[in-house]
Structures are given as C-alpha cells and as structure tokens.
Amino acid sequence: MDPFTQHMLEKAEQRSRALGISNASKFPLVECSVPSSSATSASGGDAGVLAPRSRSPGGQSAASGGGKVVTLGKATLEASPAKPLRHYTAVNKENLDMGIEINITTDKPIGVQVEIQEQEVTDDEEQAEGGALNPLLEAEPVNQPLARLRDTSRSRLQRMGALYSNTDDLSSPIHRTEGQFHVTTGEEEDCGNRSSRQPKQRLGKLAALADTINQWEDDTSHHEVHRLLEAPPPKPHLSSRRAEKGPAPLPPKKDEVDEASRTKQLKWDPKVLSSLEAQGFQRRESSTIKHTYDYAKQEEAAPASKVEDAVLTAKPPVPQKSTTVSQVAKNFASSAPAPKPAPAPAVSVKSGLVSGRAALFENKGTGGQSQGLRNQKDPCELSLKERMKLFETGNNKAMLPMAPIGSAPSITQIRAEEVKQHLAAMHPVTAAAATTVVAATKPKQENKLRDKVAALVANAQSSAETRIKDIDRQRQEDMQIISNRFNKQKELFDNQPSDSSVAAQARPPAPAPSRVVRPMPPPPPPPIAALSPGLASSKRRSPGDAPTTDEDSKRARKSHSDRLYPALSDLDSSGDNCCAAETASATDDSHQQDEEETESCMDESDDQSQTEDSSAGMCNGSLGREIMSAVQRNEVEMQQQQTGKKTVRYADQDMYYDDSSLNSSQVSAGIDDYLDEALVEDYGSTQDDQSDSGDEQNASRLSLGSKGTTASNSFSFRKNPASICTPIEEHHEMEMDLQTPLLSGAQPVKSELSVNQDNDNLVTLVHTVSFYRRQQSANSSNSTPVRKICREQQVMRSALAGDCHAKHRLEYDSPQQSDYVAAATDIADQTDEDDEEMQNAREVNDASQAQDKIKKLLSEVCKQQQVIGQASQALNLCAATVEFSGSTESVEGERYLLLATHRRQACLDEVQRLRVENSIRPVGAPKEKGLLTVKDITIPLRQEYVRKMASNNINGHHLVCLLKYNEHVLATKTVPTMPGLLSVKFPDVLQLNNVYADFRITLEIYGMLAQRDQLPHELKYHINLNKKGGIKTPKKKGGENRLVMPPVQSPAGPHVVRTPQLVQYGFAIFSLREIQRTTWTLTQVLGVSPLEGVVHMKVNCELSVSVEYKGFLTMFEDISGFGAWHRRWCYLNGSVINYWKYPDDEKRKTPMGSIDLNSCTSQKVTTAPRDICARLNTMLLECERPALETDQESLIIVPNGRTTTVRHLLSADTKEEREEWCAYLNKALTLLRAWGTTH
C-alpha cells in the first residue's frame, strides 16, 4: 500500500472515531454473523491481517454487549532486517522489532491465544486485508474463500466513499443517531493512557501535531442547540459519558444472547439525551438500546419486521403527536426490570454501518415508497407558493388532497389517519418491549378502529344535533320564500296545486332507522346515499367509497390518487355535499363572503341562499320540476318583464353581492333556459344531472381566491364572437366583465370533457375547475339580479347633484348595458383607487388646515370683542360730555364699533362654515388666488337732498363703506355730505388678498346724521390761548372740571357694550364676471335715504401668481409666401409669450416678437392637425385681430371679414416638452378666461 493511501485510511479511521461512528472494520455483516467461537478459532493468517490494523500502538480492548472482552496484547518477536514488518499504527515506527499477540477472553472458562509472527505479505493476504476493511463485504464464516476474492482498491474506495458521503442516510455527527453509545471500561482507558505515555521517537511530535489538527477539523463540541418542544419524559440517573473513548466494540450476536449474561452499565451524556428527545426520539427497553423515531406513517405488512429494528436516517420528517409517547415514557421511567422478549427471527440491521444504510436504502424501493407518499401534507393546507414549488422540484406525482377541494375531509378519513399514526408510532416500541404478540389480525384492528370512530362520533352528536335543528329551521324558512315567490305566478296565470300538496308530493321516502331522521326540504336530496345498494348504484361514486356515518355523508368523496384534479365521478350527488363545500369555502375565504354567511360554522343558511339564487339548484327535487312546468307555460310573458340592474361601484374589495327586486319573472326567465338545456342533456338519468348541477351551482359560489378546485359537471358557456371573455385574475382583480348574459345570446352547452382510457374510461375535465367557475359566475347573473359593487372615488353629494362625470351617476340600464358599464368602470378601477387615496390624504390635510384656521378665527373674535369694548367706552364718554356729544370723535368711535362688530360676526360665520364643511375650500372649487382692488368709490346723492343741504335745512350725514369677503371686512373712512356737492367720493383704496376666482364680494354703505359742532376746537379741548405763561404755584383747591356732564347716563353703566349708531343704507354684490363694470345698482334697505341708488367704482383683479415657463421652440414664419422654421427662445409670462433669438438676449434686448394670449381663440392648445402641419410635436395657437388691408390668405393667415385669424405654429423638440408647453399654455388661458384681462 502506498503511503498516500495509508495516510488517507488512517485519517478516515480517526474521523470515524471522532464522529462517534463505530469501527466498521471490526464488525461483520449482520446477515453473516457467526458465533464468537468461530472467531476465536480463526487461522493465523486471518489474525495477522487484523493485527496491523490496530489503531493504538498499545494494547486495546473492546467490550461487547454480551460481556466478551477481546484483548490485544503486544509481544516481542524477532524479525530479520531483510524483511521489515509493515506497521499500520498511528505512529509510523521504522525497523522496529515487534509482534502482535491476541488474547480473546469470554465469561466462559475458555481462552485461545494466537501468536502471529512476521511474514511476507502476499497478494492473497492483501486481498484478505481489503476484505476486512470493506464494510459492505458479506462476511460469511471465516473459512469461506469469498472473503479473499474482493478487489482491494474497490473495497477501500467504497469504505472511503461511505465515510465521506453526504447522503441523507448517513448518520449526522451532531444528532448522533447511531445506536452504539458504549463507554470504554476503566481497563481500556488505563491501557490507552499507558500507550499515550510511551515516549515517541522521531516523528512523534509531528504525528501529535497532525492529530491535533485532525481533531480541529472534526471538532464535534459545537453542537446545535435544540429547543425542547415538549417536556422530556423522566429518565433514570445515568452518569455522563467519558470525554475520551476507544473505538466501538463488536456488537453482540443474537445467537449468543443469554439472560444470565450481564450487560455493562451504559453511560449517557444528558445533553445528548435531551437533544435526541427534542428531535422526537423515544426511549425503549430492549436487549440492545436503540432509538426509534415517532413516525406518522402506515407501516407496510411485508417489510414490517425489517423496519422495526432499523435505525432511521438523520433527516426524519416532522414528528407528529402520538398517544403512545406518554406510555413509552412511563415504561422507561419504571425501574422494575421487564422480561426480555425472545428475539425476532428476522436479521436486525446494525446502525452506523454502511451495510445497514444500504439495507435501509434498498427497503425504500418497496415499502418506503408508499410511506413517503403518506408523509406529504394535504395540498389544500399548502399556500400557493408551496404548491407551485411542488411542480418546480420535479416530483413524479403531485400531492393529492384527502377530500375534493372546497369540502372538508370526513371524520372517518381524519380518524383513520390518526389511528394509522398511532399504529406507526406504537409499532417499533411494542415489537421489542411488549410481551404480547405484535402480529394481530387486520379485522380486529378495524373493529377497534370502528369502535374508536364510533365513540368520537357519538361525542360530537350533541353539538351536531343543535346545529342540525338550526339548519332545518333555516331551510324551511328559505324554501318558504321560494315557494311563495312562485305561488304568486301560479295565482296570476293558472290555478296550480298548492305548495303544500307539491311539498307532500315531493317528500322523499323515510330514511332507515339506522340513520338520524330529520325533516328535509325538497330541493336538496336527503343523505340516503349509503343506505341501500339500489340507491347507491344510481349515484356516481369514486371507486373506493365505502358506507359512511351520518357526519361523513356531508363530506365529498376522496379523489383518485393518480389525478391532481377530481373527476366527474368523484363527487357524490347528495345535497349535503354542497353544504360541506360551502363550509370549507367560508372558512378559507371569508373575505369573499357576506358577514352573515361567515358567522355560522356549518353555514347551511348560505347554502340555501345559494339554492335560492341558483337556477339549477331549484331543479333538484320534484318542486323544481313543478316550477319548470310553471315557467315554461308562461315563458313569453316572463321574458317581456325584464328588470334592469343598478350598477354602483365604490367598495374597498372587489366583491359582488346580489341585490335588486326579487322579481319572479326575472328569475324564471333564466331558470327556463337552464331547464330546457338540462332536459336535452344526455348525461344519464335526469335526477342525477339535476343533483350534480345543483352541486356545481352551489360550488360556483365559492370565492375566486380559493386555492382548491372541485369537479364540475354543470354547464360551460360558449360566448358569441362579439363578446370578450377575459380570465379573472385572483390577486389584482382587474376583471373585465364583458361576458354577455345568458338572455342576450349565450347558450349553455355541454362541458368539454375528455375520457381517460387508462383509468376505466373515467371522464375528466379539460380545464381547471376554476375556469368553469369563472364562466358560471359570469353568466349566472340572470338567475338572480346582481348588484355589482365597485370601487369608486368618493365624491360629495353636492357634486353628484351637479353636472358630474358619467361614472359618478347612477345608471339604470339593461343587464347587458350594465355589464359594459361595469367593465368600463373596472378599467379605471386602479386609477380611481389611487385618486381615492390621494383624495383621502387631501381631506385629512384640509381638515387639519380647517382646524388651524378655526383657531385663528376664534382668536380674532376675541380681539374684536376687545375693540368693541374699547369703542363702547369711548362712545359712552362722548355721550356723557356735552363737548363731544355728536362730535366727529363720536362718529369715528361709531365707525370703529361698526367695523369691529362686523369683523367679529364674519369670523363667527366662517368658523361655522368650516365646522360644517371641514375644509377650507369646497370640492371642485378653483384654487387660483388673486388680488382684488376697489378704488374710486363714488355715491351720488338725491337731488332733493342736495337742495335741502344748500338751503341749510338739514345738517347732512356721515357715510362709510364696508367691503366684505368671507372673514375679511374692510372699511373706508367716514365722509360727510357737504352742501353743494352732488355725490360723495371716498378716496380710499381697498385691497383684498388671496381672493379666489369664485368670489362674491359685498359692498355695504352705512350712514348716520351729522351734528354741527357747538363749540370750537379750543373750547372743546379747553385750550386757553389768552393766558401769559403758566401759573407759578398751583391753586390750593383742585382744578374745576370744565366738562359738563349731562344729568342722564346709560342705565347699564359706563362699561356697557353699545350698538353702532351707523345704519345701512344699501348694498351691492359683485363677482368676477362683473368686474369690468363701473356702475352697480344699490339694494335699498331703508325708505328714507340720501343716496340716489347707484354706486360708481373701479374694480381691478390681478392674479397674484402668474404662469411662467421658458424654453426653446421652433416657430413657423411666412416669408414672401414661403414657409421657414426658426428656432427661438420663448418666455411665457402671464398672458404674453415673448421670444428672442438666444437666451442671453432676454435681459439685454427687446423681444423679436410677442404673442398675446388675451386674443387667443383656441379653446385648448393641442397638437396641430396634420392637414395644417405634419411636423412632429407642433402646437397650434389661433389668435384673432382686426383685419388689415394687406392681409392675404395663406397657411397662417385666414381673413374673416372684419377680423383675421392668425395661426401660430410652435414646434417643440420632444414630446415631453410639447406636453409641458401645452399644459402651461392651457393653464394661462384658463386663468385669463376666469379673471379677465388685467387692467
């Protein structure tokens, strides 16, 4: 053997020891195990093969389970220098005279000593050595010549491949699933210590360093930390394992197991035990300690004896809960020794050996295949991604559900799986520890299983009976509604038998006494499918169906194991299957159902509501046939009484509910088409087809988001060429409901079916069930009127009352038209959703701004109240003195009091509006603000008043003007009327900022009578001009009060709040449309007024924010009849577009030309028509000006009599620039038309 191979074998041996794998070279194969006596009588040549393979330089010992001890002792032996002995020890010592002596000792007084001396290794001996190293070698008794005929290189490579393999069957170094956790005895440890203390020569240090590095590579101290899933069972006190141990000993032979033989006390590491128990391993009492895994698989009958003792792989499936775990824990915790059972005749496979792993791998081909299938989860429990992963991983077969999708599995199926899990978990434990015989007959197990299932069903009867009573009561109420609906038709057209006779006529035969008897309505057939073979033969069944209990009759049958989707024959046609399907759908996809439907567990009321809505569901019983005959006689009149549908779309989820008048003619017209087609169908008996169609009509109500599918044997629909069929996406439900209803041309046809010749000519569906469901749900709208609730942007009722978009209005159309309207609404659904989110954000922002504004207004109200108080005090003072009574100071005080009073009231009105509307601006109001200026207010006076003023008959009036806009109130100065003046002119200029384009401003005129000043100014304020200088010394007595107080004061005191004495003479209201006027008519308030009744003023409105945009445009110019394009730098500012040749010329030169948008007649700036200009990205602006004599018609000049239209062609460089220019130009035109020309 070359040094490289020798080094690799030694390293592999060290790796196996560090990983806790038993030394497979010392283990014979289990199927070829021989008694120990045959091993002791081995020949010298065989022993010589084993001798150099000893790992330790010193003697080593290994202990077996039966108490046999094999001792390898060292003996000196002379060797000639010409033939050096080959050493395969850890330390390679050269030219060392050494021999090997093997002492084999057993508990019996028998000892055999074999001496092996040095000899030349021949090819035959090398082959024998390779046979000893190969773990997969079928080691027959030692004298068998096959052991020496193996190929040396193949055996070594196989062993190295087994140790370095990364297969799933190989034991994990962390989990330590090997069963050989034996501890070396003190003698072996002492022997190992003696060998380690021997001095090492030459390469000793290097070998020690290499061994340390190898230990680094195979360090197993970093174990995974597993959290305990459940409390570990009580375990006996076991001493921890020793850190240093020798190689695993030889396993015991089953022929040598003796009750009198002693087994060494095993020492376990508590961490290892807790880790194993957390992974699902269980403790058991047996002659050889093994760890079994709690599998939830059904054990096969044939390989049961082999799998019973086999150690499972390191990657087991997820353990399931078993009822035998606590029992095993109790048995293991009991310290009383249990009698050991007789060993099974089957050969056990030892763990840790490659041969054992190969045996497990071979077993997978037979029984393991069926067990692997049972380990899979039900597809209905998986998510969409997990089911997609099934097809991506390349498995041969898809997982199949326990029951058809949309229905829950029956109680027998669930309990059968649990019982199988119990048997699978109990099997490896009871086979080795229990004293009873494991091989029991299968009928007895089935009897026990039936007893358990019966007990479980009996416990559930109490709760099921209450549900059944509620279901029956709901069924009776629903069927009463259906019968009343058609009774009205019978009374109108024909005298038909009463519903009571019909119901009595259609009542099914009484069920057998073994079943639970309860009253059943006619449409769903009673669940008597499993009573008699005669009745069962008329129903389509899956091949493996068996008679079931009452609870099981509500479940759909399990589909075939070779198909992913169920076939037509897999579903039972009993009416209760529909209920079970609805139960599964309501629990899985509750967001797609009504809240009332999802509140109950069994949801029978939902089933009946669907039966009411479904036309096919009404035909299940004899009542359905009676209805059929009634609606066929009145077919012509019922088709004429079609009612429209109301389409409103504003829901958050794309859910569809039924709503409109439950007109029987509308329902009957759709039922008639279904029934006529159903009578022509040749699926078999009419009753079977009606039952199946009822099942599928109920199943068609399953939500689109359901992950499962069920078989469909009802109708599929062939659309007209004009209609469009778009599949409904499950997640982003942007469906196009363009399917024409059945009344408008689409006719039901046979379902497209395919016959599976390989599986008993079984009829299967071409498409998935979801495809047929979508077709049914789209075309069953005529059976019951449907109200489609669609998501729509929330708009205020005030906007709905006005002229809104078509999609904001309620439309009452025919079913076909409403489908197209709904489809058009679906297209803009995503946009509406985004608009709704943006509008919600704007509403929240407006609400917060409104609250902030309310706070500011309330603070302004407080300020104005203070002004009112101060003005009232001033007026009280003026009224209390003779000097200031009726003076100009009192008039100014009246003005301040008037202004503060109106400002306070305006703020309170605005606060009230904000609290009601909760927004600063109403929805749809313009956002542009401007500056409003009012000046030169002139009020003409009446001629009679002017004459009286000239004759000094009256004293005149004081006038003041108030300009009011929302919470803003402005006031002019008080101006008196003077003799000889025909009008009163106010010199003030009033400006209102942040005025919106929809403003309505009120101009109010107030006045009061004037009084002549009785005292001059000096006397009024007691100004003494005749005194020379001031008094040197003050007077002894206080200065006399020269202000004469009137004898009568205000009864409320000097601090009372006064009402303004200024009264309103008239008012005028103007808006943006009247700003070009200069004269407004006043609305007179009082009968006697000095005003003539009109007011003259100048009003100017200016946009506070002007539109500005700059960029290059290529402009078309007509030069002597020829067109030319010139590139210009254009600048839009307000209502004028100026252009230069270069951008730098904008600040230095005057514009080369300009375009005034005030004269633009284009309603909207868009792309120029191709008959005028075919250049890309060209905009057209048409302006109008007075006609000139030199105007000649051309491409850009169009004479129109007195006016001439001038076309401006402006070409942008890119499409984006053209769109930006169009947006800014249109905005400028809109503002100009709203605010008018700036003055």
Swiss-Prot record:
Tissue: Accumulates in the ring canals that interconnect cells of the germline cysts in males and the ovarian follicles in females. These structures develop from arrested contractile rings after a specialized cytokinesis in which the closing of the invaginating plasma membrane is incomplete. Also concentrates in the arrested cleavage furrows that initially link the oocyte to its 15 nurse cells in the early egg chamber and is subsequently lost from these furrows as germline cell division is completed.
Basic and acidic residues bias: start-end ranges: 252-265, 551-563
Alphabetized InterPro entries for the sequence: AHD (IPR012966), Cytokinesis/Rho-signaling (IPR051364), PH-like_dom_sf (IPR011993), PH_Anillin (IPR037840), PH_domain (IPR001849)
PANTHER family xref list: ANILLIN, ANILLIN/RHOTEKIN RTKN
Primary location class: nucleus
Name of the gene: scra
Subcellular location: Nucleus; Cytoplasm, Cytoskeleton; Cytoplasm, Cell cortex; Cell projection, Cilium, Flagellum
Residue stretches making up the PH domain: 1106-1230
UniProt protein name: Anillin
Polar residues bias (residue ranges): 699-716
Coiled-coil residue spans: 834-861
Any GO molecular function: actin binding
Residue numbers carrying Phosphothreonine: 740, 831
Annotated GO biological process: actomyosin contractile ring assembly; actomyosin contractile ring organization; asymmetric cell division; cellularization; cytokinesis, division site positioning; intercellular bridge organization; male germline ring canal formation; male meiosis cytokinesis
